Amino acid sequence: DGYYYAIVAEGGTGYGHGINVGRSKNFYGPYECSPYNPVMRQKDPAAPIQRAGHGKLVQDQNGQWWCYYLCGRPNEGNYTTVGRESALDPVQWTEDGWFTVNEGKGPSLTQIAPDLPECIYERNLFDDFNDTRLNLEWEFVRNPDNGSWSLTERPGYYRIWTRDGQL
């Protein structure tokens, strides 16, 4: 449609977290704010799903648009034991060229799966750790501490040394 869309997280990662949108015909701006902002935010403080934000739009093979975002399910102490979960809600494009997520109702309580064929994972999920290097499936976040693990300490095993810390 000739627009650049800036999809931004606002409100931190706690309660009040949400997704706002701006758009511009020029990548460098200026950007106008969506009249539907926030396009995703939990407005009900008693709802079971909170902290909805950090979203991205994706389009599936059938042309349906979705918003993939993070959220949390707090327990009685307002802690999210499972941490930041991933969620998926449908996107609706409006007549004025903007979009809303889940018709502006906030996070769905039940996730709706896209109408796509099942994708079978073809890779072998077995690793005997008999190589001198870890397979790519053992990806590290950021730079790995190579002194905290070994494939040679006990051949055929992935040896990991933990460190002291509080959980």
Identify the residue ranges that each predicted region occupies:
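Carbohydrate-active catalytic/glycan-binding domains of CAZyme proteins
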Residues: 1-167
